[in-house]
Design a protein with these regions (language model features):
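Short active-site oxyanion
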Residues: 1-4, 65-66
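A short glycine-/small-residue-rich loop at the edge of a beta-strand within enzyme catalytic domains
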Residues: 3-6, 44
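Helix N-cap/beta->alpha junction signal
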Residues: 7-8, 72
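Conserved Rossmann-like nucleotide-cofactor binding loop
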Residues: 11
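TOPRIM fold recognition
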Residues: 19-120
Length: 120
């Protein structure tokens, strides 16, 4: 099973909206918002798993793949490195966050702006 992980609830909902717009089955996977990533730790060696992520994985042993949709900024990149450090031996982990925009919500809002411009 797959767990899609987001930095915020708005990014999670934006992702589900994008999936629905593309007519993909967004209900088949699991979703989790970390509600921010700054509490993960100062260094990789001191890192602790976010509580929500640890609990979710503990009660869902069928999860094998973690798709990270964290923000395209320093905090997001640091969090990706820390999650890889803590869980990389137990899970397949993929960085699927936006590469040219700040976050998933920006991807969605730009998509709607483009549609609006085309309809004029």
């Amino acid at each position: 099973d797959v767990l899609n992980i987001f930095e915020s609830a708005i990014d999670l909902m934006s992702f589900q909206t994008l999936e629905k717009l593309h007519k993909r089955n967004w209900k088949k996977n699991n979703y989790l918002s970390l509600s921010g990533v700054t509490a993960i730790g100062n260094s990789i060696e001191e890192s602790e798993l976010p509580i929500a992520l640890g609990k979710f994985l503990a009660i869902n042993p069928q999860i094998k793949v973690l798709n990270l949709y964290l923000d395209n900024d320093k905090a997001g990149k640091n969090s990706i490195a820390k999650i890889n450090y803590l869980l990389g031996k137990s899970y397949q982990i993929y960085d699927k966050g936006p590469k040219k925009m700040k976050d998933v919500n920006e991807v969605l809002t730009r998509k709607f702006k483009q549609k609006e411009e085309y309809s004029r």
